[in-house]
Amino acid sequence: MLTLPDYPWDTLTPYRERAAAHPDGVADLSIGTPVDPTPALIRRALTEAADAHGYPTTHGTDALRRAVVDWYARRRGVSGLDPAAVVPTVGSKEFIAWLPTLLGLGAGDVVVHPEAAYPTYAVGALLAGAEAVAADDLDALAPEVRERVRLVWTNSPANPTGAVLDAAALRRTVDAARGVGAVVCGDECYAE
């Protein structure tokens, strides 16, 4: 039976309580839980969807997938994406947890994630039966580990450090991953 570790964010409670006592308040970036009110547009959409009984499609609606592609074109200047390649999930946590499994990773494979990182990267590796390795530089890994790397996570802006990877750092990561045939997945949940 697979045993997953306790969720490490729970151990941060005393630190969060101490930070909350600071006279200037606190910007809690520890887990990314939304703190702003739900926008009116989203509230209306949820109300309208309340009477849409039945299960959703497993791959989202055509309109949703097209909206994602249009967003990338409008906000990121990325054109030519295929709506059929969009994988809607409930949130990034679900995607991060399941990507290693969806890629077919398993025993003997390595998933690399940043040293200071969201714990779900490691949980996703465990769910797939792969090994999670915390490293900020693939070239620093022992050769016998590096040759087993199949997935590399980047996180920019990073949680919890706030660090932003520049183009040169991303290029080094992509080049190193290509050298071992690994997929690079950029978790950019704080990009906006």
Which sequence ranges carry the predicted segments?
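Residue-level marker for buried hydrophobic side chains located in beta-strands
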Residues: 184-185
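N-terminal small-domain helix-loop-helix segment of the aminotransferase-like
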Residues: 2-91
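Walker B catalytic acidic pair
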Residues: 188
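Conserved core of the PLP fold type I
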Residues: 52-176, 191-192
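Residues within alpha-helical segments
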Residues: 17-20, 126, 178
